[in-house]
Swiss-Prot record:
Binds 2 Fe(2+) ions per subunit. HEAT-like PBS-type repeats lie at residues 76-102, 109-135, 267-293. This is Deoxyhypusine hydroxylase. InterPro entries: ARM-like, ARM-type_fold, Deoxyhypusine_hydroxylase, HEAT_type_2, PBS_lyase_HEAT.
Length: 322
């Protein structure tokens, strides 16, 4: 490990108890580096996913994760909401509904809570999602609720059960499924759907994830064209999938988005983390530059991204060892 990154590994979270992981996550000591708080988060996620075999520990892990919603870090809280949606543990649903309904939480955190309810396929959350889709003053929240509603309805529909989808290379539960393999979409056709603002957002996301699953240079450049969209939500999802694909062809596009002074923090932060995942040599100075960014979400994302950069250039097999 290089000395530049040692400060990100000051606390060893391997083989910690659930309570020790919670203490690191919520920074009870006041000294836990952000990168290690993220490690504790992902370790707790692993426990929360074991609800079938270890229900008591899984419930406890879910509750400990939710304790972080009282933190000041917008980045950490949004990641907690994301993780709760990825666990498939329905114990997280009422906790996420509370976050969505809390107008004192930042937009990025509430958005992630709504998206997580969709990832959980929580039919019981349709009413609250409909409420905020119709009534919330923030476009990002309305759009996220729209996607979550459409995802839940698709998952529980005959169409959703019937469609033949490509087996994903990625473990994430996405806000929309990719387009079915039943039609042989050309990349240009998918690009046109992606950028057609007259189409439903759910359909455009389906094109996005189909392009992600193709993942070659042409598909990635088609995705990058979406960075001209007016929707911050849409652009942040494109940056997120670039962090999954890790194709260096998009590095110039991510750098440009990260450097936009007028761009929404939810987009810039996702671009920073994607650069950390891609981890080519030209990424390091860019991430270091944004350790002093004027926006706290982007600054913290640069810390996490640099931690990921170090991981990608090491021989470790797991980002969050359990």
């Amino acid at each position: 490990m290089s000395t530049n990154f040692e400060k990100h590994f000051e606390v060893d979270v391997d083989n910690c108890s659930l309570e020790q992981l919670r203490d690191i996550l919520v920074n009870n000591s006041g000294k836990a580096p952000l990168a290690n708080r993220f490690r504790a988060l992902f370790n707790l996620k692993g426990h929360a996913e074991e609800f079938a075999s270890k229900p008591e520990d899984a419930l406890k892990a879910t509750q400990y994760l939710a304790e972080a919603f009282g933190d000041e870090s917008e980045l950490l809280k949004h990641e907690v909401a994301y993780v709760l949606g990825q666990t498939k543990n329905m114990a997280g649903a009422p906790l996420l509904r509370d976050v969505l309904a809390d107008d004192k939480q930042q937009c990025m955190v509430r958005h992630e809570a709504a998206e997580a309810l969709g990832a959980l396929n929580d039919v019981d959350s349709l009413d609250i999602l409909e409420k905020y889709f119709k009534e919330d003053p923030l476009l990002e929240i309305r759009q996220t609720c729209e996607l979550a509603i459409d995802r839940i309805k698709w998952e529980t529909s005959e169409e959703g059960r019937r469609e033949a989808l490509q087996e994903s290379l990625y473990s994430s539960i996405d806000p929309a499924p990719p387009f079915s393999l039943e039609k042989d979409y050309k990349i240009q056709e998918l690009k046109d759907i992606l950028n057609d603002q007259n189409r439903p957002l759910f359909e455009r996301y389906r094109a996005m994830f189909r392009l992600r699953d193709i993942g070659n240079d042409e598909a990635c450049l088609a995705l990058a064209s979406g960075f001209d969209d007016p929707s911050a939500l849409f652009k942040h999802e494109i940056a997120y999938v670039f962090g999954q694909i890790c194709n260096p062809v998009v590095v110039p596009h991510l750098k440009e988005v990260l450097a936009r002074p007028e761009e929404a923090p939810m987009v810039r932060h996702e671009a920073a983390e994607a650069l950390g995942s891609i981890a080519t040599d030209d990424v390091l100075p860019v991430l270091k530059e944004h350790l002093k960014d004027s926006d706290s979400v982007v600054r913290e994302s640069a810390i996490v991204a640099l931690d990921m950069y170090e991981y990608e250039n090491s021989n470790d097999l797991e980002y969050a060892p359990v």
